């Protein structure tokens, strides 16, 4: 079956985002339709499309993100980017967000090449905590999806859910709050 054989509408796509791990998500969706696909090839095509779409998108940071990173750095906090997407997707995203948000803003970047298990597994957060030399209770995670909130909780990191347009319908059990913008005064632990 070709990589373009699975057609999905927006509602199907949003439902698929409940599960982390693009390849797993694609394979699971195909199985639910009684189809067999080369999930790796479909995922590669999707990622190439994503990167191309980001390149000239004029993407801007979500409300409060730049201020929160700046306040954390100003207060001497270490900042991590903890995801289980591919390094290529992260590079494309940071290129699109630059110069407002740059890779250099983060003391550690965890991605799919760093850990083998996607969220909701705690591995990405455990790795970040070790790399930063931090205890979970002294940190705060900001997550935009249910699997990310579950991963932070599994690692013992308090989490604030910050849903985006594609994840507004997720369940955020375990989040200490759900917000539509980041406010450094409410998020950052006092140092």
Model-predicted segments: where are they?
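Residue-level detector of short coil/turn "hinge" positions at structural boundaries
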Residues: 3, 7-8, 37, 79, ...
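Residue-level detector of family-conserved "landmark" positions at structurally sensitive sites
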Residues: 9-13, 40, 82, 104, ...
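Intrinsic-disorder/low-complexity peptide segments enriched for small residues
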Residues: 14-15, 79, 180, 185
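A structural preference for short, pocket-lining loop segments at secondary-structure junctions
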Residues: 77-78, 83
């Amino acid at each position: 079956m070709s990589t373009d054989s699975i057609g999905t509408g927006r509602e199907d796509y949003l439902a698929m985002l409940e599960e982390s791990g693009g390849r797993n998500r694609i394979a699971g969706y195909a199985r639910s339709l009684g189809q067999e696909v080369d999930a790796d090839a479909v995922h590669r095509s999707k990622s190439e499309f994503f990167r191309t779409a980001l390149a000239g998108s004029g993407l801007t940071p979500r409300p409060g993100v730049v201020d929160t990173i700046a306040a954390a750095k100003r207060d001497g906090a270490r900042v991590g980017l903890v995801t289980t997407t591919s390094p290529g997707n992260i590079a494309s995203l940071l290129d699109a967000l630059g110069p407002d948000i740059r890779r250099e803003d983060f003391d550690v970047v965890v991605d799919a090449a760093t850990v083998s298990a996607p969220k909701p597994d705690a591995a990405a957060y455990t790795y970040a905590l070790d790399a930063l030399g931090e205890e979970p209770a002294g940190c705060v995670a900001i997550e935009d999806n249910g699997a990310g909130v579950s991963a932070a909780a599994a690692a013992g990191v308090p989490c604030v859910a910050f849903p985006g347009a594609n994840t507004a319908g997720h369940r955020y059990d375990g989040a200490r709050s759900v917000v539509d913008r980041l406010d450094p005064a409410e998020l950052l632990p006092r140092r």
